[in-house]
Each structure stands twice: as structure tokens, then as C-alpha cells.
Amino acid sequence: MKIKNIDSIEVLDSRGRPTLCTTVVLDDGCKGTAFVPSGASTGSLEAHELRDNEERYGGLGVQNASENAKKLLEDLDNKRADDQASIDKLLIEIDGTSNKSKIGANAILSVSIACTRAAANSLNLNLYEYLNILYKKQSNLHTEMSMPRPMLNIFNGGSHS
């Protein structure tokens, strides 16, 4: 289950803002795809979302982040997609900044999530089952999965609506 290809394109999110769609392909043909739309507001300590700052889309384009995501194949080629901790550590090391501003948090996150989904598909597992396996491995807890409890907002407003 080794990484063989990474493709990333600019797409529009539900608010018409550019975001990344990244697909990771494994040597067994399995794929994982991730979209990483940004929030309506950002905090001062959040990871840096790389934007093009050009005329297109009022400076919000993500073509540079898309290219950065594709270039990550140079470092991730033939890496095991099911070693999520190593992949994430390597992505952070490659960026080398505290706020992920060199490659862009959007590029890093899209590749990370796409790898996770590709690994789950390769193991013929639902994503939630695969994430549970990763959680148990990381935490050394061996609790049984249970039905999730919904968490939702009753009232919304402001920049998040």
C-alpha cells in the first residue's frame, strides 16, 4: 500500500471560494480524495492557509498550494500510506515552519487526509473503522467503538452562517 501519485486541483467550496481537491493513488490502485475548505474566520494562531494573492478570485486562489501538494510526491513516493503518523511528521518537517506557511496548511492537510482515505480504501475499511484503528494504535486504548453522539449548534449567526 505505497503512495504512487498525488494530484491536486483548485475547486470551489460551498461559498464559491477556491479550495483544494487532492487525490492520492496507491500502488494497488486504491485512491483517497480530500477537500479542505477554509472556515469563515481565522484565528491569529491558526496554521497558514496558502493563497495566491493574485487578481483571480480576489487573491483567494490556491493554485500555488495545489502545485505544492503535487510536489510532495517527491518525498512521499513509495511511502506506506498506512503509516499516518510518519506521513504527518514528514509533511510538517518538509514545511519546516511553525505555522505551515511554506507549503501551506491547506496543501499539507489535503495530502494527509487523502492518504488516510486511500489507506482505508486499500484495507477495504470504512473511514471511521480505519480511524478507530489509528486511534487505538496511537492512544493504546482498546475501547469498543460506539455510536457517535451528535454535537450541533442550535443557533448560528455572524460570519459563520
Predicted feature residues:
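Gly/Ser/Thr-rich beta-alpha loop segments that engage phosphate groups in nucleotides
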Residues: 18, 106, 159-160
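Glycine-centered tight beta-turn/hairpin loop motif at sheet-sheet or coil-to-beta transitions
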Residues: 27-29
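Short beta-strand scaffold segments in enzyme catalytic cores
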Residues: 20-24
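Short glycine-aspartate micro-motif
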Residues: 8-11, 100, 108, 144
